[in-house]
Amino acid sequence: MSGSQTVSVIGYTKMAPQSPPATVNELWFIDTQAMFQNYANLRSFSKSNSTETQTTIGGVVFGRKARKQVIHVFFAYAEDLTESNLQFLESSLSSDIELVGNVNIDGQSTLIGNGTFTLQLSSKMLENKNTSEFLDQNVIFNNDHISMEGASCVSKVGFEWSLRAGREQEDVKSAAERLSMASFRFSYLNAEHELVIREHKPETAKQKYMDKFTKGALPYKDVIEFTAMQSLTRDTSNDTEDQKLVPTVKVTKDNKHFTRLVTIGEVVFPAYFGDSSFDLYKRAREALNRRANNTMMVTVNGIRSGRGVTTTTSATYLPPGWVSLLHLQLPSKWTENEKRNYRIRLHKLFNLPSSKPCLRLSQSLPLHSESVRLTNKKLIREPHLSISNYQPAGVVTAVKGPYNYHHYMQDGIDDSGWGCAYRSFQTIWSWFILNGYTDKPVPSHRDIQQALVNIGDKEQKFVGSRQWIGSTEISYVLNELLKLECRFIATNSGAEVVERARELARHFETSGTPVMIGGNMLAHTILGVDFNEMTGETKFLILDPHYTGSEDIKTITSKGWCAWKPASFWSADHFYNMVLAQPPTDSI
């Protein structure tokens, strides 16, 4: 199989070692470390019964042909390299990414899809992460980090599918096909900036706005919302901007018993600097097609497995190490155990880590104003990232992953003077939500108090009171509600807090959770440590729950409510206890 041969069948073939092509017309770019990590992630999963004796691994390569970039190399055991899995992978990726190649490992090649080249790999190369050997065997590639770029265009598209009893699978597939065939009729409007993405759309001066917006943009934070419209005519070439466009999807009913499946798809597609109107239209149409196909495949899988017809929720992710977004339809009404098993399958399919969650709904990106959120969208997220002009004294270790800033006077509760530990607890809980360890909402003060009553630590009259809690109570509630273990650091003075800086640094390196510290009748949240081994100088990144103002990031960072504090911040005359919540190591 030469680099130019295409394949459209599924299976494995034994291949003789290939010599590299004599000439190289175009170089592709690939991040070999990302490829090696994907292989390691797959191998980290324990094998299923069906793969217990299966050692053959292959893979598929997805990329951007126009840019000659390999974006993903997905590895899989032979049994998982199926046409349906290939279609599911493609339907979940950004609409500008397509199948570009296959993988040959130790002389055995994946024969699936229409790849234009084959990566020549060996088990030893992958296990040793040997970039030099890869480049020697694959001369059309340059090893380079591929940067994330571009803005995200996002729109909500609703569609209803009527499914006849006993023929649900057939009707789901037909409905998805009809929606894909009609996708050319959809247009996307942003009224604020007078932007229209549609078929037969001529270039206008408004394109300059898109170039300005997309230059230097990042897809997970730079977003333009569009309203989806559907043309009522088949030929859209002569439509004016305001003609024959309505936000509707036609539904055909018959006289038989049917199930009505309603889906609100979050259609997301990238926009890059220099894009033409036609570039955007092609990606928008492909993104809608992929949402329909992804919904169809998840629905059919649910029917085949005996779960019946289930609704799905659109979710967009930026998994760790990825430079493009992942788009999924998640089953809404499955049991928690069913959802967990499904997430494990997705982790294997997309070569995500086996030791930590990546695809919980709480980890999805709220790109649209109506995206699903499991935390209060008004709260400030990761305020420490907005601290500017800080010069480290030594080595900085800090919290890993997002969290929300909880402080006095939020949620309509006046807890000034007594609620600081409750707020620190809520900040810690938000970390566990946003990093995918739970979908349970942040507990209120009353919820926290009731949990302490339930375990026998407090009497019933404690519920609804304005009584303080401390580090011990926080650990009790985390264990009761989330089954989490906590470590403690107890000190007799503020000076001892400084002496435990190395221990705190190890916590942030390994666990990464915010740390609640209580002492001197106050509670704070430690987000990081700056420690100089040579001089002993130590500073602490503190999030102060005693703030009573509005969600103003400038005030919070400039007035010291989220700031680096010197060792003298801790009182020499008081003891302090720290709670270090431990994330589970087997949670997906």
Swiss-Prot record:
GO molecular function: deUFMylase activity
GO cellular component, as recorded: endoplasmic reticulum; endoplasmic reticulum membrane; nucleus; perinuclear region of cytoplasm; protein-containing complex
Subcellular location: Endoplasmic reticulum membrane; Cytoplasm; Cytoplasm, Perinuclear region
Membrane topology: Peripheral membrane protein
Chief site of localization: endoplasmic reticulum
Broad enzyme group: hydrolase
Active site positions, chain numbering: 420, 544, 546
UniProt keyword Aminoacyl-tRNA synthetase, yes or no: no
Subunit details: Interacts with odr-4.
Family listed: Belongs to the peptidase C78 family.
Name this polypeptide is given: Ufm1-specific protease
Origin organism lineage: Eukaryota, Metazoa, Ecdysozoa, Nematoda, Chromadorea
